[in-house]
Amino acid sequence: MITESNAAPDLAPARMVNEYVYCPRLAYIEWVQGDFAVNADVAEGSFRHRVVDQEGGALPERPEEGEKIHARSVWLSAPEERLTAKMDLGEGEGALLTPVDYKRGALPENPERSWPADRVQLCAQGLVLRANGYGSLGGVLYYAESKTRVEVPFDEDLIEETRSAVAGLFAMAAEGKPPP
């Protein structure tokens, strides 16, 4: 819980950036007030996440060219982006990495084939990878219910949207009251 004597942390979890894009009030309740309710959806998501939440390897500090990387449940931070992220999966070759984020739900029926909050969370993971010396041109959202992988390029518009969401999350936390 964030209080006046306990100012907002320096880093926002990528997951909270997702919540902020989805519903700023929910992000405030969960991140600032520290009130997180476990419901049936959360329990099911945790069950589906059990494999990717097991540590399956670390990212090499200086990957060799052509070295295959497949690391599960990797935590990285990027103070310059004010972000921290737990990636379900980092896969790639050499210094080029693709974050893969698992979602329990179905593939949305929209032109992007993904939810805006999910794209922003994934891009936040890409920004964290970049800040740690990896190349990351895009990511993958895996919608478990549909068993579908969706590639998401990290273009300038998505990067700007992601950084704006991070700034908005911190501004909201500094307000000291939940948004309507």
What are these regions (language model features)?
Residues I2-E4, E80, E112-R113, V128-P180:
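Metal-dependent nuclease catalytic regions and adjoining charged, substrate-binding loops involved
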Residues P99-D101, Y142:
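Short, acidic/hydrophobic/Gly-rich beta-strand patch recurrent on exposed beta strands
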Residues V120-L127:
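Short amphipathic alpha-helical face segments that pack within enzyme cores
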